[in-house]
């Protein structure tokens, strides 16, 4: 490894951590699969365990021989850019979580067939745009026995920096990919689909037939608008979570956790 002391915001080599947007990162780095940013030693550790390739580290000076020392030792021959807490916060636009960031190469995109081949329970995240919600849903999915996650392209990228951090690295341990036509694609692979929505014909989440399905895809919609009407109409089930005290809905990440637990 090479420890490189930076002394300015335009220091050569640090543009991955400063000037590139999330979209630019996805399409950067020699026309490969792109790059994403991971923060905190614990989450970087999860990524390394799952085989993700580190490209560069950005680390506060005090953490080089502290919290980040083990991570640095495991990342091989990559540059480790270091500077003061204040300089790095100015460079990135935020205070580094636990003082360290890692730029990593995005993996090759999996096919829907690869992700679903051995799965029994999957979730479709359809149009969920908030990174915190996506990260929380991945963490719940991994913890509560969901086998795979399928994302529509209107959803937030699961490898968004904040989504990765909120998931605590769960995005690295559960298979996921993008999907274009959730209901028809999943029906073709032998799944019945359960759209989480409030409609006149919705069934309770504890419905016996629903629970007995051998392969089930739970479809979660946008934070404000929910699922598209066409998706609801095409689903095999429309499912509601019974609630009390006149409450008719939950935050999408909270609703997803309830659904994952009940339908596992």
Each language-model region and where it sits:
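Boundary-proximal intrinsically disordered activation/regulatory segments immediately upstream
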Residues: 1-67, 155-156
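Short acidic-hydrophobic, aromatic-tinged amphipathic segments that line or gate anion-handling sites
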Residues: 3-8, 79-84, 174-182, 239
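Active-site/ligand-binding-proximal alpha/beta "capping" segment
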Residues: 195-247
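Glycine- and other small-residue-rich loops at beta-strand/loop junctions that grip anionic moieties
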Residues: 6, 36, 126-127, 152-153, ...
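Structured adenosyl-cofactor binding patch, chiefly the S-adenosyl-L-methionine
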Residues: 100-102, 140-144, 153-172, 229-264
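Glycine/small-residue-rich loop that forms an oxyanion/phosphate-binding "nest" at active or ligand-binding sites
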Residues: 72-97
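Short, aromatic/basic amphipathic alpha-helical patches
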Residues: 66-77, 230-231
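RNA substrate-binding interface of SAM-dependent RNA methyltransferases
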Residues: 49, 82, 105-201
